[in-house]
From Swiss-Prot:
NADP(+) binds at residues 25-28, 48, 52, 82-85, 133. Binds 2 magnesium ions per subunit. This is Ketol-acid reductoisomerase (NADP(+)). Signal peptide: none annotated. GO terms for biological process: isoleucine biosynthetic process; L-valine biosynthetic process. One of its GO terms (molecular function) is magnesium ion binding. It comes from Staphylococcus haemolyticus (strain JCSC1435). Keywords: Amino-acid biosynthesis, Branched-chain amino acid biosynthesis, Magnesium, Metal-binding, NADP, Oxidoreductase.
Length: 334
């Protein structure tokens, strides 16, 4: 049975007296660094010169090039995009690790798929908040928290689990609760959720619904409202109380249509396709494709991105959002 750990579950403060280097100062980086600092820990930031470097300094941190930050630290939390972690690790982190250090991540991709292979004499652990960095920070300041996952890949010192739990508490996550997992489980479930449901699945579902209505002769604007704009109403209900809250809140007509038509759209074949997606994640095919495309300058990735940005639903949405000043519209720079 899944066990949840809270503040009172962390009996030993294994971070006490250790210097923590946060590598990266983006969404998660700023939240981890500030929460740990507010909890009294010795935190420095390692990052290359640029906007984030300046922002970390403005926020009161001692900021260093990555290599120097690693040299100074006992615990190194890597909070960089997946695609650049490998090179930064090889060139700036690995040469400066010492026996007994702890190397940490908020996502297991590069460890699980062996893009990064740490030496045997360092601890390797995971603390993965289940929410974006701005929410991790905001809830911490408010006295609550975002739940998180934690796990240990390598325990060189015999203290890796204690350190990971202490780190989770340090960023505030144990206020809400943390669940123990493995790098394998966190990575594979996270990638599957993104690809089959949250990003790949939902985007394709919305596009297909839009195309179906437009091809049948309905106005593009109405199609947009029905299959994309109103999605937020449903997701908010689901977020607050699950699918049963959606069905409680919608009309009987909508609920009946849910039961009789949902299975016609998401057929057993779709579930079989999901299983195939999961298999490609588990066997490393997806990771290999992503890593190779990254090494090739992301040619396929950028081509696919451009194709999707050109979909008709995007142009319709941009115009309709001008009619709704209550929406905090975000213009995406291409």
């Amino acid at each position: 049975m899944t066990k949840v750990y809270y503040d009172q579950s962390v009996e030993k403060d294994a971070l006490q007296g250790k210097k923590i280097a946060i590598i990266g100062y983006g969404s998660q980086g700023h939240a981890h660094a500030q929460n740990l600092k507010d909890n009294g820990y010795d935190v420095i930031v390692g990052i290359r010169p640029g906007h984030s470097f300046d922002k970390a300094k403005e926020d009161g941190f001692d900021v260093y090039p990555v290599a120097e930050a690693v040299k100074q630290a006992d615990v190194i939390m890597v909070l960089l995009p997946d695609e650049i972690q490998g090179n930064v690790y090889k060139n700036e982190i690995e040469p400066n690790l010492e026996a007994g250090n702890a190397l940490a991540f908020a996502h297991g991709f590069n460890i699980h798929f062996e893009v990064i292979k740490p030496p045997k004499d360092v601890d390797v652990f995971l603390v993965a908040p289940k929410g974006p960095g701005h929410l991790v920070r905001r809830t911490f300041v408010e006295g609550t928290a975002v739940p998180a996952l934690f796990g240990v890949q390598q325990d060189a010192t015999g203290q890796a689990r204690d350190i990971s739990l202490s780190y989770a508490k340090g960023i505030g996550a144990t206020r809400a609760g943390v669940i123990e997992t493995t790098f394998k489980e966190e990575t594979e479930t996270d990638l599957f959720g993104e690809q089959a449901v949250l990003c790949g699945g939902i985007h394709k579902l919305i596009q297909s619904g839009f195309e179906t209505l437009v091809e049948a002769g309905y106005q593009k604007e109405l199609a947009y409202f029905e299959v994309l704009h109103e999605m937020k109403l449903i997701v908010d209900l689901m977020y607050e109380g699950g699918m049963e809250n959606v069905r409680y809140s919608i009309s009987n007509t909508a609920e009946y249509g849910d039961y009789v038509s949902g299975p016609r759209v998401i057929t057993p074949d779709v579930k079989d396709n999901m299983k195939a997606v999961l298999k490609d994640i588990q066997n490393g095919n997806f990771a290999n494709s992503f890593v190779k495309d990254n090494e090739n300058g992301f040619k396929e990735f950028y081509k696919l991105r451009e194709q999707q940005h050109g979909h008709e639903i995007e142009a319709v949405g941009r115009e309709l959002r001008k009619m709704m000043p209550f929406i905090k519209s975000k213009s995406i720079q291409k």
